[in-house]
Amino acid sequence: MTKEIKRELTAIMFTDIVGFTALSAKNEREALSLLDQQREILFPIIHKYNGSIRKEIGDGLLITFRTASESVQCGIEIQSTLKSNQELKLRIAIHEGEVAVRGNDVLGDDVNIAARLEPYSAVGGIVISGRVQQNISSLPEYKTEYMGHPELKGVAQSIDIYCITSNNLPMGKKIDSLSQENKISPRPRLNIFSLTGAILTFAGLIFWIYVGFFDVSYGSANEVPSVAILMMENLGNTQD
């Protein structure tokens, strides 16, 4: 039987273990041990703030919360707890939006946005979207810093990014509003196709002028020139 799909407004958290891919390629046993350690440390904190662990994606966690403030407070406690841990280092991203919920699965554009925000987090830090920032801006215990307005792959929405600086959490790098390739405005370059088009247009104009003014048909030598005589009406009082 197909489970009912519901829509919910929720805070969405993504976590990711720093360096896990490289570790799993070198030492699978240590990588698996790190996953066990993550569950042991994070799960009790997540449940403390009424978070729902929706999915484990390799070393990443997808978690939802009822409110933005609960998700931020949970993230702060997680990162504060891990400060002394030399093995387990996380990046955390939080966004808020409407998602489709079926059983324990959550889907939607806002889930994708939360995932796209995560790489902008500093190691041991937390990044949040502008929506989360708006919801916690009146709460003095949360300090944030604006990072920028990136273009997120596969995301049509306009997203501002902030980082949490409460509890001495590290701040991520400022984000240029332009993409990496366009950070420095390039000098104007003459496109070869534009140049070719301009030359052809100019040549066509010259040809048209030449044909219009100099290609006069004189006819054959036996032809007698004809003169057109037009009747004119005398509008004056005197005869000419």
Identify the function of each model-found stretch:
Residues 3, 40-43, 47, 62-158, ...:
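Catalytic beta-strand-to-alpha-helix segment of the class III nucleotidyl cyclase homology domain
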Residues 19-20, 97-100, 232-238:
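A short, flexible beta-alpha/helix-coil linker loop
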Residues 1-77, 81:
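Catalytic NTP-binding/metal-coordinating core of nucleotidyl cyclase/transferase enzymes
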Residues 201-202, 212-240:
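An acidic helix/loop motif centered on a single conserved Asp/Glu
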